[in-house]
Amino acid sequence: MGLSLVLSCGVIAGISGFLFGYDSGIMTTTIAQEQFLQQFKPKESMVGTIVAIMQAGGFFGCLTAGKLSDLWGRRKAIMFGCVFVVVGGALQAAAYHTAMLLIGRLVTGFGVGSLTMTVPVYQAEISPPRWRGTIVGCQQLMLAIGSAIANWTGYGCSFVNSSFQWRMPLALQAVPGIVLFFGSYFLPESPRWLVEHDALDAALHVVQRLYPDKQNLDSAYAEFQEIVEQIKQEKAQASERSYLQIFRRKAWRKRLFLGAGIWLMLNLTGINVINYYLTQFFTSLGYKGRRAIFLSGVYGSVGAATTFLALFFVHRLSRKTPLMMANISQTATLIVMAGLTAASELGKSGQMGGVAMIFLFFVIYCSTWGPLSWVYASEIFPTQIRSKGYSMASAVNCEWRFYFLFVATNFISALVLLFLYPETSGKSLEAIDLLFDDHQTIHRSTLEENEVRRTSESVNAKH
């Protein structure tokens, strides 16, 4: 009981992070497998679609899970996401044409997105304050382990000369989904969700189980009372907890923007671009085929080891300072990486330097942004809107941003056209000048009046 139970719950629920890492990582190696390329013969644009469509499903999974998590509870919402992961993995492994593969990726993405929203909220709500950073950070550790295993699985299967080369790795996506589904039966429900639904006795029992030893029972009861009073106060302040209400209340709106901002800044570090197209990066540096897949495996292993070590310190660190220092360090790393990639004449030393910069970038990320982003985004929302708020914030962590980047630019372009660009259709070139307040321009009506006046004067002179 106590800390061992909290850690067990964090690790079991963290299998969702393993799913996220494995599902993302396995496609990195799959799109480089010879048998996969022979089966689907994808063009470069289709490769991008195969990679990104999972995150499109994840976007909708995040938004759906917020409501379901409030209605059903955190445990049932986790099980809900697992069903989609298992079905999606089966569809991908059995795919014989691109459409079936895309549907499988979309379904899997929906499940992973649902879990990405639900699990960090659950982990934050069951964790004593002192250990919250470590427990929620388990999500990133499991993600790193999943990514590493995906890379090594892809490397091992690359030696097989049949469709097993890519079907087996894709089929394995379903295994952690099944484990998490049945493991969820043994997880205690979130005490904050229980209090929210007036199950006070059950909530107190869970809180007492989650505290380290009997000497802390008084502290457990004190925290229980704090949870009850906080939720009671939140209910009194606002009975409505819709998504729209989050935007209406200033304090909630600020939390949402901060939570979404964390994920947006994480993605703008460039980590997902590097992870998804890792083998292509290595190929551009001269490490092709199986060598690129092997380096991907080493890359994933380094990330898992770094994250594991970081969890021993994350609960002792502040949140902001490590993130800011990481951004500065990653900026320098990316500049060097870009220079080495561009300077192809540097030869083998330049190639090795480029690989080293990729690894250094990943080490910095895994020790800072990796675990701390999950922690910060999950702990800033009040219980009353934690699921809905985090679901909207975590949706930013899905790769729909690659599309919504263009959604944003198109929408902004529409506004610019509406308010700044004058309409020119049906106007003469001279009349168009008037639209820009050109005082040197003579309006057509003025020209016509002058012409009429000159004609009239000419006629009168003749008479």
Curated annotation (Swiss-Prot):
SUPFAM superfamilies for this protein: MFS general substrate transporter
GO molecular function: carbohydrate:proton symporter activity
Keyword flag Transport: yes
Protein name from the UniProt record: MFS-type transporter criB
Highest taxon, organism lineage: Eukaryota
GO cellular component, as recorded: membrane
Record-annotated membrane-spanning stretches: 5-27, 46-66, 83-103, 106-126, 141-161, 168-188, 256-276, 293-313, 323-343, 355-375, 402-422
Function according to Swiss-Prot or TrEMBL: MFS-type transporter; part of the gene cluster that mediates the biosynthesis of echinulin family alkaloid.
Naturally occurring in which organism (per UniProt): Aspergillus cristatus
Annotated NCBIfam families: SP
Statement: the UniProt record of this protein carries the keyword Cell membrane: no
Family: Belongs to the major facilitator superfamily. Sugar transporter (TC 2.A.1.1) family.
Keywords from the named record: Membrane, Transmembrane, Transmembrane helix, Transport
Subcellular location: Membrane
Membrane topology note: Multi-pass membrane protein
